[in-house]
């Protein structure tokens, strides 16, 4: 047999904006408590179903993950705190030394904005997206099928100057970037990937436009008194966050001590038979902590 130096390879359609996001993708351990909960839900499927059925059900199935997310969001706080303790114990998270911001991210607890401008931008983005969605709904009602004329007209609207489009105190201006719809009639993987990339490009372009509009509104339309009021709200939010995290850490430490006292921590791991299992986020599934029956 003669060896060949030909290497068959192709570019991946997946793109990463930062080095940290790429490294996080390589790390398959669950980063948040919900990802840990999702692992346990997939593990239940491994216990009661065939491997082939699990692959077909989980791989590329957003409905299953949406179902798990609804279960997680509707879960009581007491039960969710038990998952918090199980997650931190399984991932060896030092809750006393890790920063409160990092711990809140791992537990998916809302954290305060880093600055007054970011707090303003969060509110601005909500209204910006709402206004953009309303324009899209009006466009769908007026024109059933997107045409070149409509796209040109939308582009002309987006290219108006600042003097023709007045800015409100917080409300986003009407100079928006149109989004390109993905056609559902194209079923091939190549066309779908191309349309998805175009949609992602348009979304990033709209986000950049939102940041530009928000910066203009912050510098030109928000006066000193309004900025001072935003600063006071942020200070109150940070104080409540510190108090809430102190309480959560105490409860978390108590639950972890109880689990360790009764020997509820398991070092057993269930490994998927196929490394291509797309369980997202991990194909090494830790055993759950089983509560002893009274």
Curated annotation (Swiss-Prot):
Residues 27-102 are annotated as: HMG-box A. This is Mitochondrial HMG-box protein CIM1. Keywords: Mitochondrion, Repeat, Transit peptide. The keyword Repeat applies. Residues 1-90 form a transit peptide. Mitochondrial HMG-box protein that limits the copy number of mitochondrial DNA (mtDNA), antagonizing HMG-box containing protein ABF2, a mtDNA packaging factor. Residues 110-258 are annotated as: HMG-box B. Signal peptide: none annotated. The keyword Signal does not apply. Changing residue 72 to A: Leads to increased mtDNA levels. The lineage of its organism: Eukaryota, Fungi, Dikarya, Ascomycota, Saccharomycotina. Disruption phenotype: Leads to increased mitochondrial DNA copy number. Disulfide bonds: none annotated. It comes from the Eukaryota. It is found in: Mitochondrion matrix. GO terms for cellular component: mitochondrial matrix. One of its GO terms (biological process) is mitochondrial genome maintenance.
């Amino acid at each position: 047999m003669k060896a060949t130096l030909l290497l068959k390879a192709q570019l991946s359609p997946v793109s990463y904006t930062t080095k940290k996001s790429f490294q996080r993708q390589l790390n398959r351990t669950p980063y948040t408590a919900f990802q840990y909960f999702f692992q346990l839900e997939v593990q239940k499927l491994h216990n009661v179903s065939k491997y082939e059925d699990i692959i077909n059900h989980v791989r590329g199935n957003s409905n299953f993950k949406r179902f798990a997310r609804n279960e997680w969001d509707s879960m009581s706080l007491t039960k969710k705190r038990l998952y918090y303790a199980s997650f931190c114990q399984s991932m060896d998270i030092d809750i006393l030394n890790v920063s409160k911001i990092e711990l809140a991210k791992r537990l998916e607890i809302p954290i305060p904005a880093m600055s007054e401008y970011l707090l303003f931008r969060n509110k601005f983005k909500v209204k910006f997206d709402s206004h953009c969605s309303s324009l899209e709904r009006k466009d769908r009602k007026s024109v059933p099928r997107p045409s070149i004329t409509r796209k040109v007209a939308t582009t002309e609207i987006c290219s108006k100057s600042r003097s023709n489009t007045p800015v409100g105190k917080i409300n986003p201006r009407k100079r928006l970037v149109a989004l390109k719809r993905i056609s559902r009639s194209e079923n091939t993987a190549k066309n779908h990937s191309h349309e998805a990339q175009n949609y992602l490009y348009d979304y990033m372009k709209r986000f950049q436009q939102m940041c530009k509009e928000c910066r203009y509104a912050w510098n030109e339309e928000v006066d000193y008194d309004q900025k001072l009021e935003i600063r006071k709200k942020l200070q109150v939010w940070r104080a409540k966050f510190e108090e809430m995290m102190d309480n959560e850490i105490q409860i978390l430490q108590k639950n972890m001590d109880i689990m360790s006292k009764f020997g509820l921590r398991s070092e057993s791991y269930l490994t998927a038979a196929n490394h291509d299992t797309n369980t997202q986020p991990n194909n090494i599934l830790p055993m759950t902590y089983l509560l002893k029956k009274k």
